[in-house]
Curated annotation (Swiss-Prot):
Name of the featured protein: Mediator-associated protein 2
Coiled coil: none
GO CC annotations, alphabetized: mediator complex; nucleolus
Organism per entry: Arabidopsis thaliana
Superkingdom classification of source: Eukaryota
Compositionally biased region (Low complexity): 134-148, 189-198
UniProt keyword Membrane present: no
Assembly description: Associated with the Mediator complex.
Compositionally biased spans, kind Basic residues: 202-211
Subcellular location per the Swiss-Prot or TrEMBL entry: Nucleus
Modification type Phosphoserine: residues: S173
Region (Disordered), start-end ranges: 128-211
Keyword annotations of the record: Nucleus, Phosphoprotein
Length: 211
């Protein structure tokens, strides 16, 4: 069966020099050294003074790398190894014929205690990052508050307008009915007045004839 294997993005190919299998023997001791990514120190010393039988801190050296921003020139490193953390793994050199050259006998950690100036610089950088983050968060909150207040004021004004229009507007049909009824009343009153005047004129005529 064919398997399609894809390397993840976190995988980094080491550019260090490969081991030469001609100089390796079964009696050589290999260490698995752990250090932060991009902060591996440079060791110019040909020999290291160590106490191989000691558990814990068993040696030290000075870093000669002046180009790294995270490390100080001449910084002191301690070599730490604990028997409970021994790797117990085989070291294999990749080649045409993969060959086992030895066992990883120690898991070594590089321990360095930073200088006070380094700690102050790190604290300043962290405080600046926090201040920038707080400023951006406050600006976002203020913009959100202004937008919400504008939305609320717009809804309130529209509601007030609708309520005001509801109070001011009166139905037109009752006015028309009232005007029509009032005009009818005026017409009836005028007709009664005219009728009464005609009757009075007739009565006057009758009186004259009788005389």
């Amino acid at each position: 069966m064919d398997f399609d294997f894809k390397v993840s993005g976190d995988f980094i190919v080491s550019g260090a020099e490969q081991l030469d299998d001609t100089d390796l023997t079964r009696s050589d001791e290999f260490w698995l050294i752990q250090a932060p990514l991009g902060q591996f120190p440079e060791i110019e010393e040909n020999t290291l003074k160590i106490e191989p039988d000691k558990d814990g801190l068993f040696g030290e050296f000075k870093d000669s790398n002046a180009g790294s921003l995270h490390l100080c020139l001449g910084a002191k490193y301690d070599l730490a190894s604990f028997h409970s953390q021994d790797a117990g793994a085989e070291l294999i050199i990749p080649s045409e014929e993969s060959m086992i050259v030895g066992k990883i006998t120690r898991r070594v950690a590089l321990v360095r205690y930073p200088e006070p100036n380094e700690l102050l610089q790190k604290m300043k950088a962290r405080t600046q990052q926090k201040l920038v983050g707080s400023v951006t968060n406050s600006s976002k909150k203020s913009s959100n508050l202004t937008q919400s207040s504008r939305h609320k004021s717009g809804t309130r004004s529209s509601r007030e307008k609708s309520m005001f229009s509801g109070f001011t507007e009166t139905p037109k049909s009752p006015k028309r009915k009232n005007s029509e009824s009032s005009s009818g009343k005026h017409r009836s009153s005028t007709s009664t007045v005219s009728g009464s005047s005609e009757r009075s004129a007739k009565s006057k005529k009758k009186v004259k004839k009788e005389e």
